[in-house]
């Protein structure tokens, strides 16, 4: 009998609520907000990015089918944090505040993301 391993969790540079820009793929250049992070697969769901359509069958008699749209996840390596003040995407670095808290900072602008 083998022990069941817990799934690998990846360290991600983005968090829920961050503003990001897509840097590769079909939606390259789009800016949106992270709705959900999936650390086990290192993926993020971004508002208005990678929108898919799904045809839903009617569930009950007399009900009509629907076409639903939803945001599918994209890999976190395809997104970069975005500064809304400077209108530029940037990598991040980790720094410490005067109080000793570890915060994320945009490398290009020096803007602190975690407040």
From Swiss-Prot:
InterPro entries: KOW (IPR005824), Rib_uL2_dom2 (IPR014722), Ribosomal_uL24 (IPR003256), Ribosomal_uL24_CS (IPR005825), Ribosomal_uL24_KOW (IPR041988), Translation_prot_SH3-like_sf (IPR008991). GO terms for cellular component: ribonucleoprotein complex; ribosome. It comes from the Bacteria. Keywords: Ribonucleoprotein, Ribosomal protein, RNA-binding, rRNA-binding. GO terms for biological process: translation. One of its GO terms (molecular function) is structural constituent of ribosome. SUPFAM superfamilies: Translation proteins SH3-like domain (SSF50104). Belongs to the universal ribosomal protein uL24 family. HAMAP family: Ribosomal_uL24_B (MF_01326_B). One of two assembly initiator proteins, it binds directly to the 5'-end of the 23S rRNA, where it nucleates assembly of the 50S subunit. One of the proteins that surrounds the polypeptide exit tunnel on the outside of the subunit. Part of the 50S ribosomal subunit. This is Large ribosomal subunit protein uL24. The gene is rplX.
